[in-house]
Amino acid sequence: GATLVVKEKIMTHGVQHAETKFYVDLNGEDSSTNVVSRSVAKEDSTQVFYSQINGNNKCAGHTECDAIIMDRATVKAIPALEANNLEASLIHEAAIGKIAGEQLIKLMTLGLTEAEAEEQIVNGFLK
């Protein structure tokens, strides 16, 4: 079976708008996909992530969206799964949240400013 792997990394700031849409049809026996999005939204930016996986045969599909939201930004994650075969195994995960205060404090105790600590966390998240 064929395998499709999609990995995206997005950072928006200012009034930028990013929208991604992934539609995957798993038609072949033992086909699979892994669609992963990691993003950071800052200031007044907006992001929309949409993924649709259709399991039309014996297959495995996974979609994941993890986002850090900052300032006044907005993030929307819309994962959709459709199993059209008894042997289709489909999973979706989505998590949106701010940088944890304890992460910032830990890095600041090592001598980083708050801005430097945020930058380190964001860079590590997107790697």
Region roles according to the model:
Residues 1-112, 122-127:
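Conserved beta-strand/loop scaffold segments within soluble protein domains that form the structured core
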